[in-house]
Amino acid sequence: MSLPNSSCLLEDKMCESNKTTMASPQLMPLVVVLSTICLVTVGLNLLVLYAVRSERKLHTVGNLYIVSLSVADLIVGAVVMPMNILYLLMSKWSLGRPLCLFWLSMDYVASTASIFSVFILCIDRYRSVQQPLRYLKYRTKTRASATILGAWFLSFLWVIPILGWNHFMQQTSVRREDKCETDFYDVTWFKVMTAIINFYLPTLLMLWFYAKIYKAVRQHCQHRELINGSLPSFSEIKLRPENPKGDAKKPGKESPWEVLKRKPKDAGGGSVLKSPSQTPKEMKSPVVFSQEDDREVDKLHCFPLDIVHMQTAAEGSSRDYVAVNQSHGQLKTDEQGLNTHGASEISEDQMLGDSQSFSRTDSDTTTETASGKGKLRSGSNTGLGYIKFTWKRLRSHSRQYVSGLHMNRERKAAKQLGFIMAAFILCWIPYFIFFMVIAFCKNCCNEHLHMFTIWLGYINSTLNPLIYPLCNENFKKTFKRILHIRS
């Protein structure tokens, strides 16, 4: 039995002069294998679409491009592959011209949409990595959907030459009724042009984009490692009051938030914490919170900005308290009843660009005088400016934190994109290389090799849904839940 050539993206029966024969018993094992590939392709892509629909964690903008790719792959598996197998079995086309045109249209449109879906997915990852915060404003489901519709619209443009080539070119091509092929199958210039637009140009651009993505992610990871090596995380910061008596409970073990929340106690042991509207009546001897090194000071701007004024209930109490104040460019923390000698301070000029510091002074007595109250009010006003400054710093570092989280997600997404692109190029490039050869040399064609390159391109639609759970934990968990697979 004569082995027919199959129609595929940019290919229509160009190997007529090199036909080979194959007996029907020899053909059946191949048909079984190809049919299995077809069923697996349909099943896996349906699983991807159902997973995205049923799992809220997968309702992301990035996964809209995955859905577009899965729809294209589903069309390849549900329409293009089965009709190719049928054509292979029949050895000739006997289903009529309308069904032939439908098959050719689905083949061209789905294959092109699959390529364009990978392309716009690559662009999305590129912009997310290169401009993470700026692109977040524009990375909406509406814009992503519009981009996807644009890609599918361009793919459907294939219908125009498939259905109306003779009408637009005002020519009549000789067509064999037992073959399913386009009217432009022997027009070399058109096929070369469409090959460049459909494959070679998008592939080169994707490789360039991915090189930029890889470089940006690598630089970001190195930058984060450098920061993490020089600046501790918020949970690692320790503010420790100097305690010459060596109390059993070391304040240095407390987190910054716990230190700020520590309440003063009255003579009877009761805690007193007054609202910010109340002015402290007394300021006992101030004490510094010592740091291991200067680099930790910069993290103090991450304090929650619930600044409170605290006051001792009874004069002469030996209980300690903390008050946040700023005077003459210094941030002081005060503790009552602690006598220290010798002043020391930690500068953070290099970290914050000003002269804020933690200081310890040698005073163990404080009298409630009018001048003292005036200084407190002045310090309170100055502290207000510090709060504004701190809030700006907090917002700046919050943006950096959000950017860091976003980059971590994009690093995983870049890994997924890398696998998708590798599968795409490995599956399609043999066919397009072979296509360019036979476009200029119609006799340089081996039918078996040609069929192999065609189906290798189709198999890309089978591999794509296997890549998603491999590189995405949410996909993996959702697949296991749907298939009732225990971890």
Swiss-Prot record:
Residues 353-370 have a biased composition (Polar residues). CDD domains: 7tmA_Histamine_H1R. It is found in: Cell membrane. Histamine binds at residues 107, 112, 198, 431. SUPFAM superfamilies: Family A G protein-coupled receptor-like. One of its GO terms (molecular function) is histamine receptor activity. Residues 238-261 have a biased composition (Basic and acidic residues). The chain crosses the membrane at residues 30-50, 65-89, 98-123, 145-164, 189-211, 417-440, 447-469. Glycans are attached at residues 5, 18. Belongs to the G-protein coupled receptor 1 family. This is Histamine H1 receptor. It comes from Gorilla gorilla gorilla (Western lowland gorilla).
